[in-house]
C-alpha cells in the first residue's frame, strides 16, 4: 500500500497551474528564438564593422600614397624649365657651358628624387596611348609609322602609376 500512496502523492504534486508551465515552455522557446536573432544581428554588425574598418584602412593607405601628388605636380614646370635651358645652344662660351653642365646636374638630381618618390616619366617611344598621351597635332611623316608618336612637346609623368600629367605629343599619320 505504500506504493499506492506514493503514486497518489505524485499525482497530487502536479501543480494546479500546469498550463502555466506549458506557457513558460513557449516563452522559453520565444526567448531562445530572440536570442538567436540577436546573435545573428550581432554577427552581421561585426562583419559590417570589419568591412568598414578594412575600407578605411585601404582609403587611408591610398591617401598616404598620393599625399604628395599636388606637390609633385607643382614641381613639373620647374624641371620643364631646366630641360629647356639645358637644350639651349651655348656655342663655345666656356661660362655658358659650365652653367649648362650645372643645369644638367640639377636635372639629374631632380630625376633621382622623382624616382625615389615614385614619379616616372611617361614613355613616348611607342604607339600613341590616350591614357598617357595627349595628341595636340598630327603630321604626315615618312620617317615615323602611322599612329606612332612623331614628336614630344611636353613630357608627361606618372606618380605611383597614376597619370600626374599626360605627355603632349604629335602623332604621325
Curated annotation (Swiss-Prot):
The keyword Membrane does not apply. One of its GO terms (molecular function) is protein homodimerization activity. SUPFAM superfamilies: Coiled-coil domain of nucleotide exchange factor GrpE, Head domain of nucleotide exchange factor GrpE. Gene3D superfamilies: 3.90.20.20, Head domain of nucleotide exchange factor GrpE. Keywords: Chaperone, Cytoplasm, Stress response. One of its GO terms (biological process) is protein folding. Pfam families: GrpE (PF01025). Belongs to the GrpE family. Homodimer. Participates actively in the response to hyperosmotic and heat shock by preventing the aggregation of stress-denatured proteins, in association with DnaK and GrpE. It is the nucleotide exchange factor for DnaK and may function as a thermosensor. Unfolded proteins bind initially to DnaJ; upon interaction with the DnaJ-bound protein, DnaK hydrolyzes its bound ATP, resulting in the formation of a stable complex. GrpE releases ADP from DnaK; ATP binding to DnaK triggers the release of the substrate protein, thus completing the reaction cycle. This is Protein GrpE. It comes from Campylobacter fetus subsp. fetus (strain 82-40).
